[in-house]
Amino acid sequence: SGDVLDFLERRLADGVSRRDPELDDIPFTGGYVGFLGYECKALTLGPNAHCSELPDAMWMRPASWIAYDHYRHHAHLLALDDRDTPGCNEAADLLDALAATLVKRPGSSEEPAPLTVPVEGSWRLSRGGYQDRVAAIQQALTRGDSYEACLTDTWTSRCDVDGWRLYRALRRRNPAPYGAYLRFTDPRVEVCSSSPERFLRVRDGIAESKPIKG
């Protein structure tokens, strides 16, 4: 019961995100990975003006993963350990499978093939609709209702392209410190992200935000 924020809060309270002091130098030691769509603002800020065709939120808890320290250039292989089951070797099996996958894959230094895809799409807002919103924002700023506003729009396109190749092309053209590629299978959703901003990071009771607007 409850919404996705309630679910994540319960799972984190159960110790999913509990960190082992011996692993403090590793960037990610387990937990949930996913996204909250813009529509999730309705959970705390009132109803939305429009709805998305995509899920409002999707999260997963990986059983095994690679944590790469870009500062030290160290890669760490990790897996969940079922300590409640004596003799369980699932974590070791997951690590072996992960290591075998790395051996089979080409090196990360290999230059990916150029990605050229003819793309046609459309904006959600018309030119006139966008201009009307700009005018409304200017009036709000003049009245003193806000000192800053971020007007965004959605561009939609349909094309046949592999999401992982698209993400790698995005990172080449727009390298940024906060990038992500997520792939979900049910329903099929892929997220490619490359941003210079850190929205929010909370660790040990300290919250950090690194916006660039303003």
Predicted regions and their residues:
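Extended alpha-helical targeting/anchoring segments
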Residues: 1-214
